[in-house]
Design a protein with these regions (language model features):
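Active/ligand-binding-proximal structured segments within catalytic/core domains
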Residues: 15, 22-72, 146, 183, ...
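Charge-rich, well-structured scaffold segments of protease-associated domains
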Residues: 11, 18, 65-224, 233, ...
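Flexible, small-/acidic-enriched active-site or ligand-binding loops
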Residues: 229-230
Length: 383
C-alpha cells in the first residue's frame, strides 16, 4: 500500500485500483468508477453507456429492481449513478455501519445484472422521455450541438443520451457485449471515504469485487484531431438566443492545464466577480447567464463560453466577449490580480473538499484518468 498524505491507494489481487480516505464521520461514501462512457460506444451503440447506467438497476441474479433500490434506502442511505463522455459511476451514501451492505450492492448490480427484456423495454421509454426533456431545454441541447461540431466524426461528439433510433434498438446482447469489453478490473477504480480502516476495506473489496475479470479493456480509444474553425447557426423557436464559443483545449497531462483552469475561473467561473459576469451582465445588462467552462478528457480538453440573451442583444454580447478575450491576450495581468485569482481558486478548491462525496468522486476520477492523486497541498503549490 502507498500512503500519500490523507489517503491510501492500493490494488486488489485482480488489479482493480482502490483509493480510500479514513474519516471519523458517521456518514460514509463509496463508489465504483469505470473508464467506459460515450466515447467507447461503437457506431450502433450511441447512448448505450447511459442506458446501461439505467438498466443496471433493473434486476440481478438475486434481486429485483425494488430490492436494489430499497437496499440502502431502507436504512436512510441512497444509491445513484451517472454517465459522462468517458466514465460511468455507481456510488452510494450511507451510515458507516452499513459499509458492507453498500459495497455488496454496488458489486451485485455491476457484476450480476441480468437485464430482463421486459424491464429494458420499460426503461427505454424513461430514457426517451429524458431525451425529449433535453431537447426541450436549449441551454442543455446547445452543449451537445457544440460538441458535435468540435469533435465531428469522433465518438466524443456523440450525445450521452443517444438518440431515439439507437435507444429503441438496444437489446440485452448489446448491454452484455459492452460490459464484457469494458468492465474489467484495470479499467475500474473503487473510491471510498468513511470511518473504516484500509485493511478492513480491502478484505471487503476482495470478497465482493475479486470476481471482476482481470486485465485491461479490450477496446482502444480513437485519438482526436482538432478541426478548422467553424460557425453553426441552428434555427429554433425560443424566447432567448443561446450561444457557445469555444475550441478543443489541453489534455490532463499537459502542463498548461492548470493555467487554463485558473484562466477559466477568472474569465467566467462560478464567482460573481468573474470578468464576463462583471463586464457583460453587470455593466451592460445584456444577459442573465454567462459562463466559461473547461472540460478535460483523457487525450483532449474542451474550453467554452456559454451565454443566453434576448436576440437583439446577442451580437453585442459576442462583441463584448471577444473584446474581453482580446484584453486578456494583449494586456498582461498585474501581479496583484494574479495573486488574488490564485487565492480565489485555492479557496474554492478548499471549500469543495468540505464535501466527502465530492472528495470520493474526485479521487476516483483522478486515479482513473491520471493514475495518481494530488493532495490539496500539492495542488495549491502548483497553482
Amino acid at each position: 500500500m502507498n500512503t500519500e498524505n490523507e489517503f491510501v491507494i492500493f490494488e486488489l489481487s485482480n488489479g482493480l485500483r482502490v483509493v480510500h480516505k479514513q474519516v471519523n464521520r458517521p456518514v460514509a461514501h463509496c463508489g465504483l468508477m469505470i473508464n467506459a462512457g460515450t466515447r467507447d460506444e461503437l457506431a450502433d451503440e450511441q447512448g448505450l453507456a447511459h442506458f446501461i447506467e439505467h438498466a443496471i438497476f433493473k434486476g440481478t441474479k438475486k434481486r429485483r429492481s425494488f430490492h436494489i433500490l430499497n437496499r440502502l434506502d431502507s436504512v436512510g442511505g441512497e444509491i445513484d449513478a451517472y454517465t459522462t463522455k468517458e466514465n460511468t459511476c455507481f456510488y452510494g451514501t450511507f451510515l458507516t455501519e452499513y459499509y458492507d451492505r453498500a459495497i455488496e450492492l454496488i458489486s451485485d448490480i455491476t457484476l450480476n445484472s441480468i437485464f430482463p427484456e421486459a424491464e429494458l423495454e420499460k426503461e427505454k421509454e424513461v430514457v426517451l422521455d429524458e431525451i425529449n426533456v433535453y431537447l426541450d431545454t436549449p441551454s442543455d441541447q446547445i452543449y451537445d450541438d457544440f460538441e458535435s461540431q468540435v469533435f465531428k466524426n469522433h465518438p466524443l461528439g456523440n450525445a450521452i443520451l443517444g438518440n431515439v433510433e439507437s435507444v429503441r434498438s438496444f437489446t440485452k446482447t448489446h448491454l452484455e457485449k459492452y460490459i464484457d469489453r469494458l468492465y474489467t478490473a484495470e479499467n475500474m477504480v473503487f473510491s471510498s471515504v468513511g470511518n473504516v480502516s484500509a485493511s478492513k476495506l480491502k478484505v471487503k473489496l476482495e470478497k465482493y469485487f475479486g470476481a471482476v475479470k482481470s486485465g485491461k479493456a479490450i477496446q482502444e480509444r480513437n485519438s482526436f484531431k482538432s478541426l478548422p474553425r467553424n460557425v453553426v447557426r441552428i434555427p429554433k423557436e425560443t424566447f432567448q438566443t443561446h450561444c457557445i464559443l469555444g475550441k478543443a483545449a489541453f489534455s490532463p497531462d499537459q502542463k498548461k492545464r492548470l493555467s487554463l483552469i485558473l484562466l477559466n475561473n477568472v474569465l467566467g467561473g462560478p464567482a460573481m466577480n468573474s470578468i464576463l459576469n462583471l463586464k457583460v451582465r453587470e455593466k451592460y445588462g445584456y444577459t442573465y447567464n454567462i459562463e466559461s467552462n473547461y472540460s478535460v478528457y483523457t487525450d483532449s480538453g474542451l474550453f467554452s463560453i456559454y451565454l443566453a440573451s434576448d436576440p437583439k442583444y446577442m451580437n453585442r454580447c459576442i462583441t463584448a466577449v471577444q473584446r474581453e478575450l482580446k484584453n486578456l491576450r494583449q494586456k498582461k495581468m498585474s501581479s496583484n490580480k494574479l495573486s488574488l485569482a490564485k487565492q480565489q481558486l485555492k479557496g474554492q478548491l478548499a471549500i469543495s473538499r468540505e464535501s466527502n462525496n465530492n472528495i470520493m468522486l474526485s479521487y476516483a476520477k483522478s486515479l482513473l484518468v491520471r493514475n495518481k492523486i494530488d493532495s490539496i497541498e500539492t495542488i495549491h503549490q502548483k497553482i
